[in-house]
Amino acid sequence: MTDPSQVKPKHVMMMAAGTGGHVFPALAVAKQLQQHGCQVSWLATPAGMENRLLKDQNIPIYQIDIQGVRGNGAVRKLLAPFKILKATYSAMRYMKQLKVDAVAGFGGYVAGPGGLAARILGIPILIHEQNAVAGFTNTQLARVASKVCEAFPNTFPASAKRVTTGNPVRKEITAILSPKWRYDSREQAGQPLNILIVGGSLGAQALNERLPDALKNLNLPLNVFHQCGQKQFEETRVRYTNAPANMSVQVMPFIEDMAQAYRDADLIICRAGALTVTEVATAGVAAVFVPLPIAVDDHQTANARFLADVGAAKICQQSTMTPENLDALLKPLMNRQLLSEMAVKARQHAQPNATQHVVDLIQTL
């Protein structure tokens, strides 16, 4: 029998770059892998935000020079095959040098050459798709991956290697108490409805411009918490002037503690990025999603449908955000019992153990 103490720890190379939507889930999995005794390294791009996010995470970074080719100019497309080959060779060199046992791709330009390198070297591949519509790189890698993880059901065609895991989320979010208890407690205390508006780190201009008047026009007792981004802070604050006396408003550039914000909210109005939808479900909050209209393949609408189709959320397309439509949408939602029922449905469709599920799958490679 093999002595477990003599078994070499699995070396897993993470592949995620470009946006927080790719990097944060990969980082959650990477930290969990380390806790399980795995060696972890990270394949990154030279200018990607992953370098900053990984700075103090005790994960060695290996960079390959690669950029996206989708929708770019003719010259870049002509050069793309050569850049991909060069990046693939660099990735192969790192993987051989580090004796990588498995790779885990979470999206971004780096995952293409990294996945190709692993395929050539015979290293097993796991991919994870955060959105309800698969990105280009993951669509290609799904053909050769050993495990295909999806956050939302039926993102990929049915196969033995497809697993619906959900998106990894922060522990502070999974620790939030049940929605029924939270909503009932606020109702028993006679609190006005708490409306949370989240535009993301840069703020969402459409939400900042159109929601203040829509909420003022409801003329109901409300506590409004509006995160608008730094650049639009003053403009958004001014839009709430002359709010009804029964409406309390806090406008802020950023929210430091999103777990607390979710915990206190009766209704959240926000974009429908993959991690946002996942966090809303995990926290258990009723939602109105306003999908980003320029999102590739309209994937934010597909993300939002995951909760809208089960009665846990409403979808409001940005192009329809007229005063009349917003009034018709919001008025029926100003009912805590209804919002509580939506929040409970959201929590029922959460997958709070997604991080461990993905880690377990990587361990089987």
UniProtKB/Swiss-Prot annotation:
EC number(s) from the headed UniProt entry: 2.4.1.227
Keywords: Cell cycle, Cell division, Cell inner membrane, Cell membrane, Cell shape, Cell wall biogenesis/degradation, Glycosyltransferase, Membrane, Peptidoglycan synthesis, Transferase
InterPro entries: GlcNAc_MurG, Glyco_trans_28_C, GlycoTrans_28_N
Top-level enzyme category: transferase
Pathway: Cell wall biogenesis; peptidoglycan biosynthesis
Key word Cell membrane present: yes
Positions of UDP-N-acetyl-alpha-D-glucosamine binding: T19, G20, G21, N131, R170, S201, I255, A274, L275, T276, V277, T278, E279, Q300
Entry's localization field: Cell inner membrane
GO molecular function terms noted in the UniProt entry: UDP-N-acetyl-D-glucosamine:N-acetylmuramoyl-L-alanyl-D-glutamyl-meso-2,6-diaminopimelyl-D-alanyl-D-alanine-diphosphoundecaprenol 4-beta-N-acetylglucosaminlytransferase activity; undecaprenyldiphospho-muramoylpentapeptide beta-N-acetylglucosaminyltransferase activity
Origin: domain of life: Bacteria
Protein's name in the database: UDP-N-acetylglucosamine--N-acetylmuramyl-(pentapeptide) pyrophosphoryl-undecaprenol N-acetylglucosamine transferase
Organism: Acinetobacter baylyi (strain ATCC 33305 / BD413 / ADP1)
